[in-house]
């Protein structure tokens, strides 16, 4: 199965990067966005034509916030925009539930999420190579057709990414830990810079810049993302809160020099234990992971 025509709905960083990657392989791409200036900017970059096609395209990619996936899909299917549909949102379960309930033809849709991005947003930050060698999760439902599954795999191949298949809920639980909660933690830390001692930011090293870099993301988009995965993110933050409370108590104990040695020893152990667990956790990011075979689509 080969994609010859593609529609991209939403010309931000991810949507425009998908369009640029497809254009690099000779695919005819049509662009649409509520923000006309974003469409024009993407078109100037060579991402495609700033209009929707007259005839149905092979695949439509919905690059809109998670809360908008289901209503936009219903609208596009009603007008017959494409033979198959996918999206690139970073939350899957919410849209999946709504699509199964409301979409004119859920069999033509498959959820998708390329795990790639930049701290900058908008079409001018887009890159055709953004997805190269990056995981791209697909979340087929019990109704997803072979055609929709196959076209999504074709798109992933065009973008140079690596397909992985997951259930929507498992995906959302995973990215709550690896993406959504870290973004909030980075925002909390960065926000303190505006409330800290005068000129404290001038003493910042590369470590703080690395820690807070992702806080530069589009706040409205990230609010939608976190809200769409609120329960899973709250669970992660609750566990962080428990660890943080233990460390705060330990630090106050260590700061009180009049405390006994036994109590100080326990507090020091709490602190060292957290640092050790953190170092071990970073190692998880360096561990090679075996590739997951892509199973046949549900039907």
Question: Which ranges hold each PLM region?
Answer:
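Rossmann-like NAD(P)(H) cofactor-binding subdomain of soluble oxidoreductases
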Residues: 72-125
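Residues at the starts of beta-strands that form the adenosine-phosphate
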Residues: 5, 28, 108, 135, ...
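Phosphate-coordination loops involved in phosphoryl transfer and adenosine-cofactor binding
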Residues: 2-5, 57, 82, 133
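Rossmann-like NAD(P)-binding element
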Residues: 52-86
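Internal alpha-helical scaffold of NAD(P)-dependent oxidoreductase catalytic cores
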Residues: 128-216
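NAD(P)+-binding Rossmann beta1-loop-alpha1 motif at the extreme N-terminus of oxidoreductases
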Residues: 1-51, 59
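Short glycine-/small-residue-rich Rossmann-like dinucleotide-binding loops
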Residues: 64-66, 90, 114, 189
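Interdomain hinge/lid region at the active-site interface
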Residues: 199-277
């Amino acid at each position: 199965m080969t994609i010859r025509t593609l529609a991209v709905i939403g010309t931000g960083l991810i949507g425009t990067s998908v369009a640029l990657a497809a254009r690099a392989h000779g695919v005819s791409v049509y662009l649409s966005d509520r923000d006309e200036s974003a469409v024009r900017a993407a078109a100037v970059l060579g991402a495609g034509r700033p209009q929707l096609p007259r005839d149905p395209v092979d695949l439509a990619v919905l690059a809109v916030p998670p809360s908008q996936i289901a209503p936009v899909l219903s609208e596009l299917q009603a007008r017959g925009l494409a033979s198959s549909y996918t999206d690139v949102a970073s939350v899957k379960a919410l849209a999946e539930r709504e699509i199964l309930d409301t979409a004119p033809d859920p069999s033509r849709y498959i959820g998708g999420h390329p795990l790639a991005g930049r701290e900058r947003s908008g079409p001018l930050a887009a890159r055709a190579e953004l997805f190269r060698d990056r995981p791209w999760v697909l979340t087929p439902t019990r109704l997803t057709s072979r055609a929709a599954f196959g076209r999504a795999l074709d798109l992933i191949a065009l973008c140079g990414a690596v397909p992985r298949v997951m259930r929507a809920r498992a995906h959302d639980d995973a990215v709550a830990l690896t993406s959504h909660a870290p973004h909030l933690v980075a925002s909390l830390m960065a926000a303190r810079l505006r409330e800290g001692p005068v000129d404290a930011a001038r003493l910042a090293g590369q470590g703080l810049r690395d820690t807070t870099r992702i806080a530069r993301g589009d706040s409205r988009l990230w609010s939608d993302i976190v809200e769409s995965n609120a329960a899973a993110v709250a669970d992660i933050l609750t566990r962080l809160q428990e660890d943080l409370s233990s460390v705060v108590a330990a630090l106050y104990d260590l700061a009180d020099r009049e405390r006994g040695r036994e109590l100080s020893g326990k507090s020091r152990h709490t602190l060292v234990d957290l640092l050790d667990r953190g170092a071990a956790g970073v190692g998880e990011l360096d561990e090679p992971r075996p590739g997951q075979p892509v199973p046949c689509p549900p039907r």
